[in-house]
């Protein structure tokens, strides 16, 4: 049996008298791939925010990478989680190069400042862009990309730190059928690697 990457025990979220999520009980082990399906308003985004350690539940215990929320430095923990979704996408600087959008994830920041990146960082960023078919866009300005190209860059960024848990929030939203199929095919090839992180895809 693999190492437990994530566990929720009697987790729920309330807004006033209304329960918007839960109660939930489940766990994910290393190497597993999960898909969370549901209509709008079902609580998928709330769940993802909890899993990404960006929201605390009203009740219950959440453990991420063997660390219990409320008893750990969340900033340090977040460096071990890859997140691709609208929360991150909205804050990516449009005037940044594609390569820098991916590279800055190594410091868990958005936007290039005065960080030093070594050859390993550069090589990993370009390898990820290659995996998702956008290597040739490395020097392009992020804001000039199509929606499909941006999605591929965002997934590459989420994987830059070699995370132990990968969270994808509707990664194919806004793409046409061909773009959706191509992105999911590339991700399926990546996820087939036994060394790929435990993954939750919300759609």
Which role does the model predict for each range below?
Residues 116, 141-145:
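Conserved ABC ATPase signature
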Residues 60-70, 77:
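Conserved ABC transporter NBD signature motif
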Residues 6, 20-23, 138:
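Conserved structural motif at the start of ABC-family nucleotide-binding domains
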Residues 162:
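Conserved catalytic motifs of ABC-family nucleotide-binding domains
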Residues 52:
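Helix-to-loop junction immediately C-terminal to a conserved catalytic motif
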Residues 37-39:
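The feature captures the beta-strand-to-loop junction immediately N-terminal to the Walker
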Residues 166-170:
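Catalytic Walker B motif of ABC-type/P-loop ATPase nucleotide-binding domains
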């Amino acid at each position: 049996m693999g190492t437990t990457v994530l566990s929720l025990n009697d987790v729920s979220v309330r807004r006033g008298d209304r329960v918007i999520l839960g109660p939930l009980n489940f766990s994910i082990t290393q190497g597993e791939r999960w898909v969370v399906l549901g209509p709008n308003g079902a609580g998928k985004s709330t769940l993802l925010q909890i899993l990404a350690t960006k929201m605390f539940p009203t009740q219950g215990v959440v453990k991420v990478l063997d660390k219990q929320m409320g008893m750990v430095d969340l900033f340090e923990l977040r460096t071990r989680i890859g997140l691709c979704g609208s929360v991150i996408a909205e804050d990516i600087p449009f005037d940044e190069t594609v390569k820098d959008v991916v590279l800055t994830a190594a410091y868990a920041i958005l936007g290039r400042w005065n960080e030093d990146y070594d050859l390993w960082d550069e090589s990993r960023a370009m390898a990820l862009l290659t995996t998702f078919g956008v290597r040739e866009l490395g020097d392009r300005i992020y804001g000039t990309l199509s929606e499909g190209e941006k999605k591929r860059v965002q997934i590459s960024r989420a994987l830059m730190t070699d995370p132990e848990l990968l969270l994808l929030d509707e990664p194919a939203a806004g793409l046409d059928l061909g773009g959706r199929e191509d992105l999911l095919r590339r991700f399926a090839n990546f996820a087939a690697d036994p060394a790929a992180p435990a993954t939750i895809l919300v759609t």
